[in-house]
Structures are given as structure tokens and as C-alpha cells.
């Protein structure tokens, strides 16, 4: 089933249609927001984690530009309006519990983080070479 509210064709044209999910379908946190995991189209890099309230969700669906609620500034924030590093929506997909949105985006300028980095995830906690590979018993999932 196609869960996308907004799609972008190969020429870069957006196609907007009525989303299959409405804001009322989401399970929101105590502040009335839903976390959004932002992933770059193509590379599949995780760029950032942000939050949407209803107004941000509706504006994102309406414009095709990722819009969030800034918890620190208490205001609506369309990514890239001042920096030029816009995030154009490729798809919006809800997780199985309807409490998180995965946004696939076309990241303009290659920078998503306010620090100037490509991704907000650039502070290693445990390096891959230190992680032990463990097999998962699929029957016990």
C-alpha cells in the first residue's frame, strides 16, 4: 500500500494528494508532537531527528517542504528558509505504531545539521569495530 502523502517524480516535480493518514491518526507525545526521522534520498543517510505538531505536519503536506516545530524557540520552522538548505519531501511514512514519521527528503546543499555537518549524527558513542556481531534467532522475535 502506498502511504505517501507527497511524491516527487524523476524530473523533480511534486505531486500532492490527500494523505492517507490525518494528524488525528497519529499517537502524539505529551506535548502533542510526533518525532520525525529524516533520511536522505539516495544515500539513505539518517540526517536528523525533529518534531512536528499539527501545524508543521499540515504545512509540510501542503508545501512539500519539511516543516517542524522548534521546541527551543517554540515556533514553526521550515528547514532551510534562512540557510538555503531546504529539505524537499520525497515521502512521508508512518511507523507500525503511528507514533513516528519517517521522512525521506532531497537535502538541498548537502547540509542538514545546524553545525554545518551533513548529518546531525556525527558524535560516535561506540564505534562499529567495537561492536560484537551477534546472530538473531528469528523464531524468538
Region spans (language model):
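C-terminal binding/interaction regions
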Residues: 2-33, 40-47, 52-141
Amino acid at each position: 500500500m502506498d502511504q505517501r502523502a507527497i511524491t516527487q517524480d524523476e524530473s523533480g516535480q511534486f505531486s500532492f494528494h490527500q494523505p492517507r493518514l490525518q494528524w488525528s491518526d497519529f499517537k502524539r507525545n505529551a506535548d502533542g508532537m510526533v518525532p520525525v526521522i529524516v533520511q536522505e534520498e539516495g544515500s539513505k543517510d539518517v540526517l536528523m531527528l525533529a518534531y512536528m505538531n499539527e501545524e508543521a505536519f499540515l504545512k509540510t503536506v501542503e508545501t512539500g517542504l519539511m516543516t517542524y516545530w522548534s521546541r527551543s524557540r517554540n515556533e514553526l520552522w521550515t528547514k532551510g528558509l534562512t540557510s538555503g538548505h531546504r529539505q524537499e519531501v520525497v515521502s512521508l511514512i508512518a511507523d507500525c505504531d503511528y507514533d513516528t514519521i519517517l521522512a525521506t527528503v532531497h537535502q538541498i546543499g548537502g547540509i542538514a545539521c545546524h553545525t554545518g555537518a551533513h548529518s546531525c549524527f556525527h558524535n560516535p558513542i561506540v564505534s562499529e569495530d567495537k561492536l560484537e556481531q551477534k546472530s538473531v534467532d528469528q523464531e524468538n522475535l
